[in-house]
Amino acid sequence: MSEEPVAAPGTISHPVYKLKRNWTWWYLNDERNKSWEERLKNVKTFSSVGEFWALHDSIKPPSGLNPPSDYNVFRDGIEPMWEVPQNQNGGRWLITIEKGRTPEIMDTIWTEILMAMIGEQFSDDIESLCGIVCNVRGKGSKISVWTTNSADDGANLRIGGVLKQVLNNASMIHQRPLYDVLRYEDHESCQKKTSSGVKAKHAIYAVEPREEKAPVPVSTETPATPAT
């Protein structure tokens, strides 16, 4: 039997600063005997910083969920599924979290991106951003940021650049790398293939790989004898 992620309300109060837009937190539980639609629960729509932190601090972090479960936080009015109009032509920036990594890594990535998203750190490109998904799985989890138009390379690359900056800053604070690479995939390709078989449209590395310099050719010719 799946447990709901909501814990008993705490006593910590948070300042109420209004957000520029409302966001809805969704939870997909691990009851595999039910349909996907039956498993998906609307947890809460929040419209202020205080409401966000009150919710964030009162439920389990992603690492505390039973696999296979999902957390989704999307702009209010957008459901966390490929089929809705805002998502059907979109794509995602994907971060893969290998099974051997510590649980805190996933929780940190999730919270850092959430704060950037609701805090409008993506500037005008926030209009191209639909939400964030955390897929908790036993063999390795994923966190992805969904955008509404996979063909809008400019907006998608700028969003990826902000994600890199946010996560690299957090990596320095936590004194350990949080990710290796951000991969951008379109939803249509993901539906047709497994994630490992999807070719990324874009890739952004935490540390850009160094270009291997071609070795300087060594001449095997015998130098000419200088004239006397």
Swiss-Prot record:
The keyword Hydrolase does not apply. GO terms for biological process: determination of adult lifespan; embryo development ending in birth or egg hatching; negative regulation of response to oxidative stress; positive regulation of translation; translational initiation. It comes from the Eukaryota. GO terms for molecular function: RNA 7-methylguanosine cap binding; RNA trimethylguanosine cap binding; translation initiation factor activity. Disruption phenotype: RNAi-mediated knockdown increases lifespan. Lifespan is further increased in an age-1 hx546, daf-2 e1370, clk-1 qm30 or eat-2 ad465 mutant background. InterPro entries: TIF_eIF4e-like, TIF_eIF_4E, TIF_eIF_4E_CS. Keywords: Disulfide bond, Initiation factor, Protein biosynthesis, RNA-binding, Translation regulation. The keyword S-adenosyl-L-methionine does not apply. One of its GO terms (cellular component) is eukaryotic translation initiation factor 4F complex. Highly expressed in all somatic tissues. PROSITE patterns: IF4E. Disulfide bonds join C130-C134. Recognizes and binds the 7-methylguanosine-containing mRNA cap during an early step in the initiation of protein synthesis and facilitates ribosome binding by inducing the unwinding of the mRNAs secondary structures. All 5 eIF4E proteins bind monomethyl cap structures. Only ife-1, ife-2 and ife-5 bind trimethyl cap structures which result from trans-splicing. Translation of trimethyl cap structure mRNAs may be regulated by intracellular redox state; disulfide bonds change the width and depth of the cap-binding cavity determining selectivity to mRNA caps. PANTHER family: EUKARYOTIC TRANSLATION INITIATION FACTOR 4E RELATED, EUKARYOTIC TRANSLATION INITIATION FACTOR 4E-2. eIF4F is a multi-subunit complex, the composition of which varies with external and internal environmental conditions. It is composed of at least eIF4A, eIF4E and eIF4G. eIF4E is also known to interact with other partners. Belongs to the eukaryotic initiation factor 4E family. This is Eukaryotic translation initiation factor 4E-2. It comes from Caenorhabditis elegans.
